């Protein structure tokens, strides 16, 4: 009898070992032609970087000082227009090439994969984080789905199910790391990022999925799929900061709340711009942002490049929330990683080097807009004042924003 029990135990162990999948074997099962265009594979239990790796390196390694705009480190980093020649590994090399088409404004992407079954019909992806659930329809025969625009330092769950049978094709969970929630909407809405995630001087954090900044959002660069991604992200409002020559008259995505104050330039001129009715245009922007956040609608604001006017408003909003000024200058310089038409305008021909065949980003923290706007708010703060107090003084005494609105904005945006 004891011998029989031993045999049964051994057989059970053999069967169990055969059923247990080796991770390498499991990954190899999802290689081949069907997956050759997929992003790197995401597996249950993985910890992955959400922020683009080049942007993450910059944000992690660089520390600036308040009230000192004489230096910048941005040109030391691969992934933007700096006219430095790099080899194929991103290492400076005289035999390399300058960056021709920066892509680091796009966040990291990963693929969820499953066994192909063309007979089972269409599928649905459900991707869930603590504050947002997204669903995406997938066509029959699909065997993977790429996911991107992930929020850093967040736990996710995912499930892919067949619509007809309810059978689960793939499911699991993963977590993310990183410093910045970047967003990219097809087919070419660039230079986008969430204002969430930044830490304040008093130890709080700006909430995610509330306010987004980016480059132009218009029909020419937002496809049908991109419009669906914008809605899925929780964005319900669009603020166009452009001037008379290119400002929109209605939202790019049907159903979005819309505001367009008509602003011709960024910097201090923008902060003191008054409309025909005698209303400060920056107050119009702040009022619309506050209304959107109050109503639970993510708001995406942009100019053309998402650099000067957009950068001015970002310094104001994050500065008001208490993000340190030295961190604001890092946030401002992230636009360096965006492509031509976003980090640099094609009309700025003086920044093109014909000999090297490369552009040069020039709107770093040492130059206009940032080196003009930051001192402006510091001067308003006065001796011993904080940057946030300077922004608050501007809003109450220059722009005409009620103190109650400022307090409400902080309460809604910080955790």
Regions found by a protein language model. Give the residues of each.
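Sec-dependent signal peptide recognition
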Residues: 2-10
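Cys-dependent protein tyrosine phosphatase-like superfamily
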Residues: 20-299, 313-415
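Residues at the beta-strand->loop junction immediately N-terminal to the Walker
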Residues: 302
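Ser/Thr-glycine-rich phosphate-binding loops at phosphate-binding pockets of nucleotides
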Residues: 305, 309-310
């Amino acid at each position: 009898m004891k011998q029989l029990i031993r045999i049964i135990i051994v057989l059970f162990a053999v069967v169990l070992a055969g059923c247990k999948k080796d991770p390498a074997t499991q990954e190899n099962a999802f290689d081949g032609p069907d997956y050759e265009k997929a992003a790197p594979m995401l597996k249950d239990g993985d910890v992955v970087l959400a922020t683009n790796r080049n942007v993450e390196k910059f944000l992690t390694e660089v520390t600036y000082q308040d009230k000192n705009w004489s230096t910048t480190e941005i040109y030391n980093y691969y992934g933007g227009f700096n006219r430095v020649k790099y080899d194929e590994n991103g290492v400076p090399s005289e035999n390399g090439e300058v960056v021709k088409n920066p892509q680091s404004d796009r966040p990291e992407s990963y693929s969820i994969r499953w066994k192909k079954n063309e007979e089972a019909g269409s599928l649905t992806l459900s991707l869930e984080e603590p504050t947002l659930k997204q669903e995406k329809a997938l066509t029959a025969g699909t065997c993977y789905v790429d996911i991107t625009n992930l929020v850093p330092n967040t736990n996710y769950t995912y499930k892919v199910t067949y619509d007809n049978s309810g059978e689960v094709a793939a499911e699991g969970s993963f977590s993310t790391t990183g410093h910045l929630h970047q967003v990219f909407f097809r087919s070419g809405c660039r230079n986008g990022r969430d204002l969430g995630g930044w830490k304040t001087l008093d130890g709080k954090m700006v909430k995610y999925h509330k306010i987004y900044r980016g480059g132009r959002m218009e029909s020419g660069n937002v496809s049908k799929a991109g419009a669906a991604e914008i809605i899925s992200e929780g964005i319900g409002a669009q603020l166009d900061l452009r001037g008379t020559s290119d400002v929109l008259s209605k939202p790019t995505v049907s159903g979005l709340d819309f505001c367009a104050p008509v602003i011709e330039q960024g910097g201090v001129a923008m902060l003191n711009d008054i409309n025909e009715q005698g209303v400060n245009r920056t107050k119009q922007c702040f009022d619309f942002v506050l209304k959107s956040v109050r109503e639970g609608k993510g708001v995406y604001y942009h100019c053309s490049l998402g650099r000067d006017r957009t950068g001015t408003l970002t310094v104001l909003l994050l500065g008001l929330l208490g993000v340190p000024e030295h961190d604001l200058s890092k946030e401002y310089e992230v636009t360096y990683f965006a492509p031509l038409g976003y980090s640099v305008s094609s009309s700025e021909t003086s920044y093109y080097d014909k000999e090297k065949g490369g552009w040069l980003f020039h709107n770093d923290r040492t130059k206009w807009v940032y080196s003009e706007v930051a001192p402006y708010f510091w001067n308003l703060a006065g001796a011993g004042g904080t940057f946030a107090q300077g922004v608050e003084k501007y809003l109450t005494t220059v722009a005409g924003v009620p103190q109650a609105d400022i307090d409400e904005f902080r309460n809604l945006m910080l955790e």
